[in-house]
Amino acid sequence: MTKGADIIAAIILLALAIAIIVYLLHWLYRRSSKEVSFVRTGMLGEKVVISGGAFVLPIIHNITQVGMRTLSLTIKRGGDKSLITKDRMRAELVTEFFTKVPPDPRAVSTAAQTLGNRTLDPEHLREVVQGRFADALGEVAAKMTLDEIQENRGQFVKEVTKIADESIGHTGLALETVSIISLDQAPIEQFNPA
């Protein structure tokens, strides 16, 4: 009878040990998804996880999540912030910039370092890149007349995309495309006679 009890006790202990190991693996192993990658830092250096997973020990490691989805950021330039064109006209412009972190370890690492968790929320990301996008719009608008912008929207978008993509490339982001939603001449009240 002792031998049977010993076997049952061994089976129970083995099952308990397996349950504890499975629980620890579930708790310590972090997986990335198609929408969210992460960068693990701490012991053994940096590890970028784009598809797959890694062990994360809470005391020794820190993780920074990086959103991999394409985010749409609307930039409005109107009123006293309207663009000034080559012919000194004021243009009110609404554009959408589509940006994301490319699935490249270097880009994910850079985005984690420069942007942190802001890549997960369009509003927080807008705070970081809005000025860069507005500068690109202003720079290209200053080289073209209002009529040229209207007639050559494709060229305007191409130049804005080039300048904006270079500007945000240092943050780990890549610009997919720019879309002009609306383009109008600003009301005459917005003109400064001086």
Indicate where each model-derived feature is located.
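N-terminal hydrophobic membrane-entry segments
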Residues: 1-194
